[in-house]
Each structure stands twice: as C-alpha cells, then as structure tokens.
Amino acid sequence: MKNLWLVLIMLSMFAFARADDYISVNNYIQNPYNNQISAGGRNFVTESDIQNKGLWEQFFTNGTYNAVGLASWAVLNVPNNNYAYGANLFMQSGHVGGFALGGMLEVVNPFLQPGYRYLSGDISYALLPNQQVVTPSELYLEYQLPNQVQVDGGWIFLETPWMNSYDDAMLVSGTFQGVLVNYQMTDNWRLTAIGTNAYQEMGSNSFNQDTMYNSSYGNFVTRSPSTGLQQVIPNGYGSDGSLAFGAIYKPSADYNLNLWGYSFSEYANTLYADSNYQVHLNSSNKFNFGVQVGNQNTWGMANTVPELVGYGGVNSYLGGAKIAYSYDEWFKAELSYDGMYGQQSSFYGGGFISPYTFTIVNDPLYTSGLGAGLIEQGAGNSWRAATTFHPIPGDSHTKIELAYEQFNTVSPMQEWDLDIKWVPEGAPRGLIVHWEADYAIAPSSDLVNGGDFFFMQTILSYNY
C-alpha cells in the first residue's frame, strides 16, 4: 500500500494538462446508474453555478442523486427459483473547493425474505440476495480538479476490466474499500491507480477479505475444477486487497487502447491490454475490430491461495479478437474468439483466476456469455457469435440480443443466450423491463456443470 500512496502523490504533483470530459463535475463516476435513463433527468452544473452560488448552495444544489426501485425473479433449473426486491439511493453533493461527499444505500428484501425455501440443495445466486440486506455500499470523499485529477476514497465503486462493481442484472453492487485516482496526463492519455484492502460482495452487509471464490458465494454453475464440489475455495482463504494501475489512450471516438496491471494479494498478478478500432464505411455502415491479450503469474508471491488449497499456482496467457458490423445503430452482428493457455498442472489447467468477477461473468473477455466464460470454464479456447437489433427499425424502445458460445475448455460447454431490454412506450420515463435467459449443455462427466442447465431472470427497474 505504501507504493500506492507514492503514486498518488506523484499524480497530484503533475496535474497540469487539459483533458476530455471524464474528470468533470458532470460525470459522476461513482454512480452505478450514471448512464441509465432517469425520470428526473440529469443535473448539469454550469460555470455560472460554480461562480455565483455560495458554498452551502454549491454543496446542496450542484450534486446529483438517483433513487432506483428494483424487483427481480430468477429461475435456476426449474423448479429452483428465487426473487428479490428493494431500492437503492445514490447521492453525491456538489463540489466545494474541489471536495464532495457521496454514498449509496442499498435496501433489499426489507419485509419478506425469500431465504432458501424455493431452492434445492445449496444453489445460490449472489446477484439476488436470499436475505434482508440494508447497507451503505458506498460512502466516500471525493476531490476533483476538473479536467486534471480526481481522487475517490472510502467505500467506492469500481468499473475496470477485472474489478467491476456492477452489472445490469444486479440488484446490489460489489464495492471496495480503498482509493481510486484518475489523472488526465494529456488530452489523449488518462492514468488510473487503485488500492483496496476489503470487498463487499453482493448481498453482504459488511466489507471483508473474501472473494467470489470463497464457498459462501459458490455459483450455481461452476464447481471446484479438481473435486467437483461447489466449495471452490474454503472460507478463510481470502485476499488482503489489490493494487491496480491503468493507462487509457483515447485519441478519438473511434479508437481506444487500455493497458492494465493488477496485483491481487494472495492470488495472482494480472497484465491485460485491449484495443478497439471503428471503421466507418459511410454514415450508416461501420465495422469494429478488437484485440485483447493478457498474462497471469505469481511473480513476487509465495504460497498463494490456489497453491495452498491444492489447485496449483496461476500461470496463464490470454489472446482474443473480435470483429463486428453495425448498421445505423439498428443492427449489429459480432464474431469473437478467446484462447487461454498455461501449464496443465497450474490452476484450472492453465486458466485465469479472477477474484472479483468469477461467477458474476462481468469480466472483459469477448466470448463471455450470460452464464459463464473462460474464467468459469477453465483453460482452452472459446468463440461467440452474437447479434443485437431493434425489432422495429427506428424504434429504440426494444433491444434484443441473441448469442451462442462454444467453450472447448477444461470444462467444455455450449451456451445459448437471449437478452431483451424493453422501455414500454407511454410508461413513466425511467422504467425498464429486462429479461434474460441462458441455456447450457455440458457433458454429464463435466465436473463444473454436468448435463443441461437453464437460467432465466426478469428485472423490473425504475430510475429517478
């Protein structure tokens, strides 16, 4: 952690560059609902708001809030089903002298708790808590020098490739205790530094050293690669925290490059990069090309958790590519491929380990499906074919995504996905109906997910 503080000091000393709008009083990067439709619209702070208001008025009126009501029902291999409901309130004050306060309160299942009475065995689904959850998932102090530096410290929300707090199928988020620093080095380059020492997994009321591999959060699909048990890594084998450093290069809206390095304490180091480039044939037709590479290792680490529990150390390489075609924001088709390889005696036959995206499947891999990806299925290769479209051209009220994934991995699987988002015409602004379904087939001898598997979830949300 000492190294992180040195980086923070250095970033603050060299904050003298112009920037894009990422570090801005109008971009609330701690808000999980920052880019979603809201009935209350957006509060845009102007230069006049900053110059002509008193300090208290700036604090109370130059900020933002989102109140989100949520209800969801999921079916996990009929007749196993579960529901959850609740509301989340995010609030951030306006900046005064560069400083702002923010936080989010999550309230799930306040009156009736579904528990496990609708579920067989120990099948659990972390995105839909089975118990009552009332917790401040975020509480932070922010300092911002617009277009140059932003520091967020406390219980914070992260949105990076391998530490991602939110997915639109979640009723609750997975937040971190730590510090996030963004520094706009030039107009095109932004640097990011992260240091954390605790994690609050979905459905928890407190921050701790657990990861998504601990047995309390065992997934309904993925089981131990060596024993077939749902207890992937026993409780008590957690992580003391993480360090991450990123460099984001974005010279235009059509090209970006992301470079990341992570150190997940007691687990592994991760080096990762991806790049995307769009080619416009004309105003309606365009292609998108992407590549991603990565490496995991245990340099400088002794007695990592995977080794201690008998799964072998982490040692793996990743490579992937995608090509997509889109027409006039109405239709998109995409084909992607990922390969992940390492020593067969290493963790999951040479696979990656991902402490904070495992089983949530919100990692950056191109071929990840709704139910699983290479992180869940182990070393090998996978490919994905998908299409996204609006059923009625020119009408954006309904969006449908169809996808097929093939995993030629330690734990092989085929998966079909259907994802529908619907904004009812004439309904209150901010109301969204989200329905997704996943059907997977795996060999009966597959220790991860033997036989057929079906998952369906309906999410109703209202954002104000």
Predicted regions and their residues:
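Hydrophobic, lipid-facing positions within transmembrane beta-strands of outer-membrane proteins
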Residues: 85-89, 135-139, 177-179, 241-245, ...
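Surface-exposed coil loops of outer-membrane beta-barrel proteins
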Residues: 33, 115-133, 137-138, 148-252, ...
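Transmembrane beta-strand segments that form the barrel wall of outer-membrane beta-barrel proteins
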Residues: 68-75, 151-166, 191-193, 245, ...
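C-terminal structural cap/anchor segments
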Residues: 332-423
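Beta-barrel outer-membrane channel/assembly domains of diderm bacteria
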Residues: 18-158, 182-183, 189, 283, ...
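Solvent-exposed loop/turn segments connecting transmembrane beta-strands
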Residues: 76-82, 145, 158, 166-173, ...
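N-terminal signal peptide c-region/cleavage motif recognized by signal peptidases
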Residues: 12-16
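Outer-membrane beta-barrel translocator/channel fold
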Residues: 108-114, 189-242, 284-359, 433-463
